[in-house]
């Protein structure tokens, strides 16, 4: 059983964020609702609206958060000082009270443009940079408690696949199978099912296919990509199954993807660039003659959100560090015919990588 995060955990995270901002030559960090605020203060508003909520973190003074007065009760448990504002007040003037007039701040990537512009009007000398660019490891490197949650989410997703793989596919619609996946995600401990992709036959050539009323048929390749949120952290896995025995070509394409996924996993090590993981997978697929049919990056970070830094993509030279969690999900997509993708979540360790998904990567034959 994972322990809940405490005020001490959030205080340590805010202290670390302030130190990283100072090291980057910044005055502090501005955090708006979303995963950043949940991570740093344990607070998530009931809804994200046009009313500004913003946490200001400085190395030189205690953290403080501006909140709408009507939302103050929900914010009280956060281990920060609160400054509320009422409808009719100048919210940006109130927010400016928490900031240095000529400060340079890392701000949440998800901050609304209207709020950034409002702060700039209130403090014309202030400057803002992307939090991801300025503090790249803040959420990307998970601590032991987070890694425990990530591993549990991965194991739960594995249990979903093992159960769905024993069910009947042929003669059922993609939508029906997707509904089963969503139900199983909850049954295996997720609070929410975030997404379910069931892409059969030619639909498998669309990586982000939305399940349809197409009836799965004998001879189909079926891509199953699904995930949810468990104890606040995300799962995301993909397996491709075949209805009956595959053709020689289908088996060959599948094996290329499997080998590419393994090559990418083998490239995971501290100090390696994120792009090295992408290059490893892409090299295998290109070498087999399918380079133009691998049409997306090899992976994305995952944690409080399903897609977050770091990204395994050409041009991403950021070094891999122990504690980073990300997907490895190469694919080959043949328009009008079929697609194959295999995805695991991997946690970088001191000496390589640890798969958080353990179901077989061999082609599963289903009925």
What are these regions (language model features)?
Residues 1-367:
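Active-site neighborhoods and metal-handling regions in enzymes and metal-associated proteins
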């Amino acid at each position: 059983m994972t322990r809940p995060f405490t005020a001490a955990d959030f205080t340590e995270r805010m202290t670390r964020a302030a130190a990283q901002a100072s090291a980057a030559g910044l005055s502090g960090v501005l955090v708006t609702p979303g995963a950043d605020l949940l991570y740093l203060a344990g607070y998530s508003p009931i809804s994200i609206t046009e009313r500004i909520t913003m946490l200001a973190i400085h190395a030189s003074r205690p953290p403080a958060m501006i909140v709408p007065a009507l939302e103050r009760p929900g914010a009280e448990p956060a281990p920060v000082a609160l400054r509320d504002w009422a409808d009719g007040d100048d919210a940006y003037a109130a927010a400016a009270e928490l900031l240095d007039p000529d400060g340079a701040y890392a701000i949440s990537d998800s901050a609304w443009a209207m709020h950034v512009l409002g702060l700039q009007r209130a403090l014309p000398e202030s400057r803002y940079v992307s939090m991801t660019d300025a503090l790249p490891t803040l959420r990307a490197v998970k601590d032991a408690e987070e890694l425990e949650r990530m591993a549990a989410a991965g194991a739960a997703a594995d249990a979903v696949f093992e159960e769905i793989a024993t069910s009947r596919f042929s003669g059922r619609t993609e939508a029906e199978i997707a509904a089963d996946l969503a139900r199983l995600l909850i049954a295996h401990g997720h609070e929410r099912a975030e997404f379910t992709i069931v892409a059969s036959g030619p639909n498998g050539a669309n990586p982000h296919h939305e399940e349809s009323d197409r009836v799965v048929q004998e001879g189909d390749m079926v891509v199953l990509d699904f995930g949810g949120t468990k104890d606040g952290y995300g799962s995301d896995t993909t397996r491709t199954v075949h209805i009956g025995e595959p053709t020689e070509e289908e088996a060959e394409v599948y094996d290329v993807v499997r080998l590419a996924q393994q090559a990418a996993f083998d490239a995971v090590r501290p100090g390696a660039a994120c792009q090295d993981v992408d290059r490893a997978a892409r090299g295998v697929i290109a070498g087999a003659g399918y380079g133009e049919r691998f049409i997306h990056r090899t992976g994305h970070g995952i944690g409080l959100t399903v897609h977050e830094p770091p990204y395994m993509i050409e041009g991403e030279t950021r070094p891999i560090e122990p504690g980073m969690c990300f997907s490895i999900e190469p694919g080959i997509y043949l328009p009008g015919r079929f697609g194959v993708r295999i995805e695991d979540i991997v946690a970088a360790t001191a000496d390589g990588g640890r798969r958080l998904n353990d179901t077989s990567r061999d082609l599963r034959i289903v009925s």
